[in-house]
Amino acid sequence: MIRLGSIVAVALLAAALGASAAAPEEGRPALRAPGLSPVPLPPRAHGVSPGSENAAPRSSKPEDSTQEKPPAPRTRAELLNDLYARLAASKDADETAGLIGAIDRLELESGSDAGDLLMARAVAAMAAKNYDVALALLDKLVDLHPEWAEAWNKRATVRFLVDDDRGSMADIAHVLKLEPRHIGALAGMGVILEREGFRDDALRAYQRALQIAPQLKSLKDSVERLTKAVQGEDL
């Protein structure tokens, strides 16, 4: 049995809805229920998905495919080319020293963690004058990274330090095949040739290095000294 209270409540609800809601505008959606007057729906209640009222309007403008992309990182070879070009054009001794330092740091990078670790150990052994240990490490290094000019240059240096001029020159030749601009290798070649009495050839090696680093004082001094010596021999 329906209670009287329920009937009264329904009647009051219907009356309230009818009093508060005006007749729906023509063409405007409305909520309709049996026994109740049509209730107009608010404008955003139809044709709108939940949460879409806060969504940013979608731009009809197509994305610009010509937007500039960030430049790709420069390769090691590109960085070296730039440093050597700046070195050749340098007019200042301090700038030259800084550029040579930057070149040396780049040339010490193998591109692999294992190679860099072996090189660090070899350099430490050289500093401690443990030349046998340094040679063993560098032998391994040139086997692992035969394309790495600095590995050959470091072994050339150790061989020079233990008076193995022939072995040092062989390694220097390999360095210059991989990196013809290697200043240390060219200077080392000049030192060995001069020590062996080949002053003309030593002078040419120093001059070649000086073309790469025109403001390096040690090379200037070597060229000046040997030029005088060679000219004196020709008199």
Cite the ranges covered by each PLM segment:
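Sec-dependent N-terminal signal peptides
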Residues: 1-27
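Compositionally biased, proline/threonine/alanine/serine-rich low-complexity intrinsically disordered stretches
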Residues: 21-111, 128, 231-235
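Terminal, low-structured helical/coil segments at or just beyond the last alpha-helical repeat
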Residues: 71-74, 98, 203-204, 208-235
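Alpha-solenoid helical repeat scaffolds
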Residues: 84, 101-104, 139, 173, ...
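Residue-level signature for tetratricopeptide repeat
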Residues: 86-89, 124, 158, 192, ...
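Alpha-helical adaptor scaffolds
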Residues: 112-184
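Register position in tetratricopeptide repeats
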Residues: 127, 161, 195-196, 228-232
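Residue-level signature of tetratricopeptide-repeat
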Residues: 155-159, 189, 223
